[in-house]
């Protein structure tokens, strides 16, 4: 019974992240939605790892790897966003045309 609740929560978080990523106009909000998507994927990895083979920690270890990857992605993304904000004075997606100077 708990398995279905966790999967429903994961699908709900993934849907919120996809919706926010599609409708977001701010780059910081899009980055946060991307983190939400990665966290819902981690929830699925840990749930299925516990369901199918609780003695081996393959899903848990892979989830830790995804957390490290998400932290690196957030650090790089925020540094790029701070550079864009410093140069363009805006973090809106529709105003960030890098082809024109």
Swiss-Prot record:
Where, by residue number, does the polypeptide cross the bilayer? Answer: 2-22, 32-52, 61-81
Q: How does it sit in the membrane?
A: Multi-pass membrane protein
Q: What family does the Swiss-Prot or TrEMBL record give for this protein?
A: Belongs to the complex I subunit 4L family.
What GO biological process, any one, is recorded here?
photosynthesis, light reaction
A single GO molecular-function term is: oxidoreductase activity, acting on NAD(P)H, quinone or similar compound as acceptor
Kindly name one Pfam family recorded for this protein. Answer: Oxidored_q2
- EC numbers: 7.1.1.-
From what organism does this protein derive? Oryza sativa subsp. japonica
Q: What is this protein called?
A: NAD(P)H-quinone oxidoreductase subunit 4L, chloroplastic
* Oligomer status and interactors: NDH is composed of at least 16 different subunits, 5 of which are encoded in the nucleus.
Catalytic activity, as annotated: a plastoquinone + NADH + (n+1) H(+)(in) = a plastoquinol + NAD(+) + n H(+)(out); a plastoquinone + NADPH + (n+1) H(+)(in) = a plastoquinol + NADP(+) + n H(+)(out)
Q: Which UniProt keywords apply?
A: Chloroplast, Membrane, NAD, NADP, Plastid, Plastoquinone, Quinone, Thylakoid, Translocase, Transmembrane, Transmembrane helix, Transport
What the protein does comes down to: NDH shuttles electrons from NAD(P)H:plastoquinone, via FMN and iron-sulfur (Fe-S) centers, to quinones in the photosynthetic chain and possibly in a chloroplast respiratory chain. The immediate electron acceptor for the enzyme in this species is believed to be plastoquinone. Couples the redox reaction to proton translocation, and thus conserves the redox energy in a proton gradient.
Please tell me whether the keyword NAD is annotated for this protein: yes
User: Where mainly located?
Assistant: plastid
- State any GO CC term: NADH dehydrogenase complex
NCBIfam families tied to this protein: PRK05715.1-2 (NF004320)
* Enzyme kind, highest EC tier: translocase
User: Key word Iron present in the record?
Assistant: no
- Compartment(s) of residence: Plastid, Chloroplast thylakoid membrane
